[in-house]
Amino acid sequence: MIRIQKLSKTFDRTPVLTDLNMTIQTGSIYGLIGVNGAGKTTLIKHMSGMLKGDEGSITYDGEPIWENDTLKQCIGLIPDELYFPNGYSLRDMRSIYSGFYENWNEDRFHQLAGLFKLDEKAKIRTFSKGMKKQAAFCLVMATMPAYLLLDEPIDGLDPIVRKLVWKAIVDDVADRRMSVLVSSHNVKEMEGICDYIGILSHGRMLME
C-alpha cells in the first residue's frame, strides 16, 4: 500500500501541493486526473523520492521513500519527459538497468522489446517519441517493480501500442499484485483501466 498523508510543497512561496491525502491499495491501478499544472508531475516526483515535501509523509507499506535506496529498487518510474544519454542504444540502456536493479529480468526485457518491435541495437535518439516511451516501458517493466509510477505514459502512442501497454500493466497487477499510479488528463481512458480515480486541482485532491 502506498500512503500519502498531509503532503504539502511550496516553490518560491507558491503552494504546489496542499495537505494532500491519498492511498493506493496493493495490487490496484490508481488514476490521477488533472489538467496541466494541477500538480501531478510534482506529486510523482515526491512519490519517487526525487523531492521531499515541506510537510507530510509518503510511505510504501510503512516505509518512507525519502533517501531510502532499498525501497527505490522496488519502484519503477516513467516520467512524462524522458531522458536517455546521447548515443546510447536500447541495448546500452539494458546494461545500465540490469547492473543497477537487483530484480532485473532479462527474459521480460527481450519479450517486451520484441512485442513492441524495437531494435535493441538502434540508437534511441533515432526513435520517435512513441518509440522512446516504449523503450522506457521495456526497461522499467523488466526491473519487476512492486510499485509503478507513470506520468502521462500513453501520450504519443498509437491505439494498438496503447492496448499492448495496458495489457502488460494489467497482467503484472494480476500476477504480481503490482501497485500502479497513472497520471493523465484523459478521463475516459482512465475510467476504463483504473480501479480508483482521484481528481487533482491546484495541488489539492478534489475527489476520489
Task: Give short role names for the model-derived ranges.
Residues 2, 17-19, 72:
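Conserved structural motif at the start of ABC-family nucleotide-binding domains
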Residues 30-35:
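The feature captures the beta-strand-to-loop junction immediately N-terminal to the Walker
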Residues 48:
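Helix-to-loop junction immediately C-terminal to a conserved catalytic motif
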Residues 56-71:
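Conserved ABC transporter NBD signature motif
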Residues 79-135:
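ABC-family P-loop ATPase nucleotide-binding domains
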Residues 148-152:
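Catalytic Walker B motif of ABC-type/P-loop ATPase nucleotide-binding domains
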Residues 163-176:
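Helical segment within the ABC ATPase nucleotide-binding domain
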